[in-house]
Amino acid sequence: MVRLPYPFYEELDNSQKYEVFKYCWNDLDNTIILRKFLEPDIKLRIEMGRNYSADLRSKSDAQIAEVIFARELKWKHGIIADRPTIAPDYMFKYTVPDDVKFETKQLQDVLEVIRAAEFRLSEAGVVQMPDSIKSLNIKIADTIYTMGMGGLHSTESWMHYPEDTEYLIFDRDVASYYPRIILNQGLYPKHLTKHFLTIYNSVVERRLAAKESGDKLTANSLKIVINGSFGKFGSVYSILFSPDLLIQTTISGQLYLLMLIERLHLAGMTIISG
């Protein structure tokens, strides 16, 4: 993209008109390229819009998720979803699940720090990570891990690990990690009642089934709903706003990873990055 070569109010001579002509053609060419690039996303939004009687073409993934959950709650359960009213100084704690347990004293101490931590909302409605958690440097073997709103991160510098006849490197991912945590712990925005969980479970199960059967359109549509809804749990402007759910999910995800890392380490394996 390029800037307009002359002020829009300027009277142009013939040579300047030709420059504007080239500018317009450049705009058109790039618009066509952008349209082709976005075509799958546009088609997906049109199809989803038909299913939910809504024009979703200009909406982000998170906005689409919000519309769909609002529609499902109203159509299936008669619930009119409104934004919750939560005080700016709202404070809450993370609830440690029964299945989170550590073998080493170091990680048991980390768990107690997290159990005691108080989460608060800023005046803008953003969840603040407690300093006691932000300052944690969790050393397992030669790697240091930190916890944050965005997940668990290892702090290694540049490294090179070759695979050879003695060492194998494995890279594993978890399907629908956060959604499974939400479902397994029975989490839901309190103002939307447990009916939210019923709809959420249906979306996750339908998406996995579509992915398994090769139905890409349905799988991609429902992926938008799942991923988009999680982003809205932290937005004070959303009907899905639920700071407790957001923290319960993200902190649980990090603790489960630390449990896995600890067990692999105790079994004699090396964690390259997390």
Task: Give, region by region, the residue ranges found by the protein language model.
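Conserved "right-hand" nucleotidyltransferase catalytic core of DNA-directed polymerases
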Residues: 1-4, 9-175, 263, 270-274
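Helical catalytic core of nucleic-acid polymerases
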Residues: 7-12, 134-274
